[in-house]
């Protein structure tokens, strides 16, 4: 009888210890997510950058992936893609190069269209642009008035979005490597998120499309300055092609050596 009692006491102790340990781990993980979100909020609070020309005076992380003749430069890129089951059907892309040395912003707006029935039938067009007084203007004449208006009215989320609102979602996971300063955020966003609303309105995306978000970048999470980052929005509707919006801000610093 005594042995039987000891057995149940030991079992109860094991269960209690397991609950305490599991609860402690859960609280530790939850606290870590709160801490990382607070750090990301400091980074995202540096946006929006309403005037792109202010980037002339802003430094960021050095990015080693660009050629030596493209230094002291911010690169801003966005793309809107329609993707079928296994192929790209349509993509509009804007790429701007913000040269901190010459105080000039130049780039191009590209459009790509692929025929699903004929893989060899692909249409690609590129339109050179520049930014003057925070407005996108063409460096060559464009005869299509609708396309001209579309490109001239183009804005990046880093200009007009509410990036900190992404952190309000309860369905997010954030990771951060303090040795490299790389971070990653992924999860789902509701249709009430202002960035989701803006993109759906801009690109005529179905209102009921579900939205997944991913944010990658490099930062110490202290919000000291603007950091390299890549932002992805994935819109999915049953029976519809997937729509992907990407936006990135990267920096390459002139070496002092």
Curated annotation (Swiss-Prot):
Localisation: Cell membrane
Pfam families xrefs: DUF576
InterPro entries associated with the record: Csa (IPR007595), Csa_sf (IPR038641)
Record keywords: Cell membrane, Membrane, Transmembrane, Transmembrane helix
Record membrane topology: Single-pass membrane protein
A GO cellular-component term linked to this record: plasma membrane
Transmembrane regions: 6-26
Protein family (similarity comment): Belongs to the staphylococcal tandem lipoprotein family.
Stated name of the protein: Uncharacterized protein SA0203
Organism field: Staphylococcus aureus (strain N315)
